């Protein structure tokens, strides 16, 4: 049974939106049940006593998203703030991650798609040796490679979202879409930056920002390597013990 009031003492490091959001959904251990069975979720309002935040972090990318540590020092919340019972908490959290992966993949796709659109226009306007860059076969091949990767990622995301229309996306499809989109976004944005030469490396033209953000999406929401482990687990039909 859950006590009338829940007390939290812990640290959540590198939390997006920390100090900016009006409230926080916090998953924490709430019972002595073994392993993940004791994990539930509560809602903690910004004004709760004992809730404080660390310094705002300066990240390589994601400059528009505040990020900081969250500290819970004897934070008490009423039972009405209980969102997920301990018995179901971890399972529901994992299901939510399946949905988050699709959103993450979409953001990675947006970075790559915007980079491709920008550099496609650039290579038609920029000239070398008396003709546009796009007239060189090496540039044409890179454009084609970038387009194929962008469209493949788009289809994987659409597949995961379409098959989830009656529920949440499945872990195999959402992890596949996220993993491919994350890797693709890094490849496409860095290729676009390279095609632009020094202009791509210049903050004035925005391409270097897309590169920085593209690398961030491959870390947020479960790293690329974690997605590959999820994919392998779904293929085999069981989770692997990575600890023993």
Language model features by range: what are they?
Residues 1-11:
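Single conserved hydrophobic/aromatic residue that forms the stacking wall/gate
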Residues 4, 16-20, 32-36, 60-64, ...:
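Solvent-exposed alpha-helices and their adjacent loops that cap or buttress functional pockets
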Residues 12-48:
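DPxDG-like acidic metal-binding loop motif
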